[in-house]
Amino acid sequence: MNSETLDVTGLKCPLPILRAKKALAQMQQGDVLTVLATDGGAPGDFEAFCRQTGHVLLDASEQDGVFTLVVQHK
C-alpha cells in the first residue's frame, strides 16, 4: 500500500476534487491519498466524492484553517 500527499491549499472548488481525482487515477486499490485543502467546502465535497466513486474517506480534520482529508482508493 502506497501513500501520497496532495497539497491543494489556496485552490477553490472544484479544483481540489479534480486534482484528487487525477491523483487517485494513478494509484492502486488500497493506496491512500492525503489531501491538504483550505476551501471551506472541501470536507463536504470529498464526502460526496467518495460516496459517488466508492473511495473511502478515512479521516477529515481541520487545523489552523487547513483541512486534512485522507482518502483510500477503492
Curated annotation (Swiss-Prot):
It comes from the Bacteria. Gene3D superfamilies: TusA-like domain (3.30.110.40). The active site is at C13 (cysteine persulfide intermediate). Belongs to the sulfur carrier protein TusA family. This is Putative sulfur carrier protein NMB0681. It comes from Neisseria meningitidis serogroup B (strain ATCC BAA-335 / MC58).
